């Protein structure tokens, strides 16, 4: 079944900003949340669809890829774990917290709410294993809202100023009665700002901020792993009416490596060796992130044996301890043999038969003796 367009799911335009997307998400998430629609499978599916759309469209990097490539550009990035340390967007408690904040005045103490701090942003950065292990500095481009430099975020045209809202008298809130209860909500006239702009700024049209793509340099420390995140303070969306900006969270996603698999601070790899080296022992070359090194293989090594190379893993970004490289040996069967080579192998195999079999091929002899006992028991 093909997925619906994420913008269509949230009911917003393709140039919608973070605030519009968040507002649409809150409304739809409250409508379809499973706690409010128990037993309704259709509502649960819609909730998942809305949540997925929100997660993609509020991540600057994923949104850019979705805009360019559609669903194919983001399906692989999400994988099975979503956005790891970022969670999956706002949970239901966050939604109710924001909504009740609007109804009851935000601060819950009845005081003025004031301009809202800007929203936090998320950006998923893909790194190679080498970049994650050694650290790297990268430039990223982040679409966001920035304070208008013409009006300094006030929203008012040069030479004019914002006026106190006549409806809420500057508090940003109005009181309404609902039955026996008196509740506060954001003033519908000034939208909670407490100010009215009669002569709006020509650049930002009275918003005090506008959409812009910022280029930022991000320093990734050595030793990070998938799920780690770096906070860039004040690099999120600009706040309303000159309020402080939110933060930008850069989440790390390390791509799969063709040789190594990482588990914590340890690295794992498979090393093919000839059956001669496995039988007689010797030194082989193995790869590390710092180049090739020698590994001593003990005689009579079997496939699956693990060799530990201490200190050849990853240095922890938190403790500074260095992990190990674990090399799993895979004994390679020779292929494309000549007739003379085959004859030599036959002669070698014949030398293992008879009384010498238990000495030279203990696992094979033990296996076949076990099979024989099994069938003897069945027929006895």
Curated annotation (Swiss-Prot):
- Keyword field contains Zinc: yes
Q: Which residues bind Zn(2+) 2?
A: 165, 168, 187, 190
Cofactor(s) for this UniProt protein: Zn(2+)
Keywords noted in UniProt: Chaperone, Cytoplasm, DNA replication, Metal-binding, Repeat, Stress response, Zinc, Zinc-finger
Per UniProt, the cofactor note for this protein states: Binds 2 Zn(2+) ions per monomer.
What's this chain's function?
A: Participates actively in the response to hyperosmotic and heat shock by preventing the aggregation of stress-denatured proteins and by disaggregating proteins, also in an autonomous, DnaK-independent fashion. Unfolded proteins bind initially to DnaJ; upon interaction with the DnaJ-bound protein, DnaK hydrolyzes its bound ATP, resulting in the formation of a stable complex. GrpE releases ADP from DnaK; ATP binding to DnaK triggers the release of the substrate protein, thus completing the reaction cycle.
Q: Specify the protein name.
A: Chaperone protein DnaJ
Annotated source species: Aeromonas hydrophila subsp. hydrophila (strain ATCC 7966 / DSM 30187 / BCRC 13018 / CCUG 14551 / JCM 1027 / KCTC 2358 / NCIMB 9240 / NCTC 8049)
